[in-house]
Amino acid sequence: MASISETSDDGSNGGVPNQKPEEPHKNPQEEKENQNENPNEADEEDDHQDEEVENVPPIPRKIPPVLIENTIAPLRRCHYPKLSLLSNAFRQVISSEDLFQVRSLIGSTEPVLYTLITFKYPTFEEGRWFILQRRNNTSLKLNCVTSLPPMFLGCTAVTIGHKIYVVGGYNFRYNKTISTVLEIDCRFNTCRHLRNMKRDRCSAVAGVIDGRIYVVAGRQRRFDDWVEVFDVETERWELVPGPFSSFASSSGKFIVHVVLDNKIYIMDGDYCFAYDPRRRRWETWGPESAQRSYWHLSSCVVDDLLYAIVPREIFGASIVVYDPRGIAWRPVMGLEFWPNLVYFESKMANFGGKLVILGCYRSSFDYYRKDVWCVEVALEKHEDGQIWGKVESLSLVNAFPMSPFFELSRTVTI
């Protein structure tokens, strides 16, 4: 084993690094006699040191596949940054596509939440993607993904596997709605431009059905171009002709939407719609319908059930759940101790089967410093069909000097 000794610069050697301290003066005759007595001592010591160095195993230039599969791939991604510091070989493995293919094959993938945040007060800033990262087994942090460019206001996004597809928006520089499409590879946080949509769209609806991306509205309602579909394999767009609901907003801008039961559910003021791309059919429900009654902005789908945050005094619960087969809302039980966040400005997402809510204790219109909190809720379905929830964690994940607006929250699998 090779050892490294440290030398101190304490003035005994004149302040010159790595220079040995000056030894006491010796008689030249004594030095000569000492050298004659042990002529091979120095050579033996050098040979011994060389032998120790030779016994040190070399740093591998390539990590064996069996080591990748058994030790690196099963690790949580939060450990990869430290692992990459060990050697260039580890850095190459962690930045390779092969590692993520192995993670998928052995079932070690994990959900990763991306949130698009804009800042509108006191000054406007374009949206940036933030990633919710787990620093250890319990601690969470919301960090900006600086390698990704700012997003256009009014864009929408869907996820397929480890990719986020961002479509449309409004370009303030040129004062126009756009048809831009970006593909974000969340394994490496890189993006590329795809073929533009056939129409410019802002504040559109988007959903993935049968592996294809459907984009609805985002422009004036017209029969022939209100819907278009993107094939991710051929990277081609096609317009989908009507019909559409006559109750839908003519401006084509909607409040919130989700994919549920292979349909795209859309909330528009007093009305609720469902678009079935397979049959090209629309369903419409009025303000008194069960579908519209408790659906609010902060909502998401888990296991084909729609969850939404509501004022507690309405239903006696903080979160309600909608089953499209039973066409009924029910309270999520077990959430008596619930953080008092500003939920009409929060954003809920499906995080690997759990509910994750990002929000603040103060309104975004309050110009003071904003602390962003994350609530993790585990879900459990009992034998009687009742859904129970448990707050697993409440974490302060970031603080901003300006008011954050949570535009989108999307979960990918990496």
Curated annotation (Swiss-Prot):
Domain F-box, first and last residues per copy: 58-105
Protein keywords: Kelch repeat, Repeat
Stretch list, region Disordered: 1-61
Classification via Pfam families: Kelch_FKB95
Acidic residues bias: start-end ranges: 40-54
Amino acid composition bias (Basic and acidic residues), ranges on this chain: 20-35
Segments passing through the bilayer: none
Kelch repeats by residue range: 163-211, 212-258, 263-302, 305-349
Record protein name field: Putative F-box/kelch-repeat protein At2g29800
